[in-house]
């Protein structure tokens, strides 16, 4: 009612867009947005209100310039014989051959770091494909509910989400996943899967975004997107507001000034047995 009172016949397109954008903002959902030819109404508070805990400058110091790239993943062996993979997005699907080559190359290392910091998501199938390399048996990784009617609580019963092991090369050593508040949507799901695969999560709480988005077009041509299918962890707790790390670490000012990524260094210590 509060917003309907603000809509009058004399509103310009910009003014109407602002009113509707503010109304959608009440949901505080990063998957909810509205787009027009001139703007995108969005809620990015899930990452903008928190420390970044990630730096491209620091990342370049670890990857250097001779890192390998395969299937959109950047990887190398660090100088302490720890494998490192940076996964910036799940917008594209890495090929099974790509993942075979990466894991084969990193097989001699003593452990593996998968860095998904600031990965805002993409394809759930891409997240599942990568996670399937880290389990030797089918496991329960969470639950999902589907919208089945117009009512506020018209959702299905909990439906199991299960992860099957890849039929290709699988990792058998320790693995750490690095997170920050920029981890969202499919990347948030990846962290949920990897926790059930036995990985240690290090960094900051993820941004969340545990709802499959649905898009539609408004009569005036603007498009609107909203969450339709809520998702939960194995304890049937919503991960919409993020997943807490096993070891909470942030990049310190001192380390940043020295060119050190505090979160990567903590993962290296763990994998080295310290």
Regions inferred by a protein language model and the residue ranges of each:
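A recurrent domain-boundary module in secreted/ectodomain proteins
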Residues: 262-274
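Conserved acidic, small-residue-rich alpha-beta core segments centered on
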Residues: 125-260, 265
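Flexible, low-complexity junctional segments that flank or bridge functional domains
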Residues: 1-146, 153-160, 174, 201, ...
């Amino acid at each position: 009612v509060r917003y309907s009172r603000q809509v009058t016949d004399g509103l310009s397109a910009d003014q109407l867009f602002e009113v509707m954008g503010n109304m959608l903002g009440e949901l505080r959902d990063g998957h909810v947005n509205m787009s027009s030819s001139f703007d995108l109404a969005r809620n990015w508070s899930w990452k903008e209100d928190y420390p970044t805990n990630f730096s491209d400058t620091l990342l370049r110091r670890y990857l250097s310039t001779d890192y390998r790239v395969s299937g959109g993943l950047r990887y190398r062996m660090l100088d302490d014989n720890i494998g490192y993979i940076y996964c910036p997005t799940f917008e594209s699907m890495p090929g099974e051959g790509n993942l075979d080559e990466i894991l084969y190359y990193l097989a001699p290392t003593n452990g593996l770091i998968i860095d998904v910091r600031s990965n805002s998501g993409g394809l759930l199938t891409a997240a599942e494909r990568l996670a399937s390399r880290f389990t030797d048996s089918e496991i329960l990784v969470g639950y999902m509910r589907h919208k089945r009617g117009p009512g506020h609580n018209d959702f299905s019963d909990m439906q199991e989400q299960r992860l099957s092991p890849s039929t290709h090369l699988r990792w058998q050593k320790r693995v750490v996943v690095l997170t920050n508040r920029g981890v969202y949507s499919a990347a948030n799901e990846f962290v949920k899967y990897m926790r059930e695969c036995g990985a240690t999560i290090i960094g900051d709480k993820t941004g969340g975004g545990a709802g499959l988005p649905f898009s539609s077009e408004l009569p005036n041509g603007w498009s609107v997107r909203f969450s339709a299918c809520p998702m939960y962890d194995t304890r049937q707790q919503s991960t919409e507001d993020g997943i807490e790390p096993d070891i909470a670490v942030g990049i310190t000012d001192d380390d940043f000034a020295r060119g050190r990524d505090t979160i990567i260094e903590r993962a290296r210590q763990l994998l080295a047995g310290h």
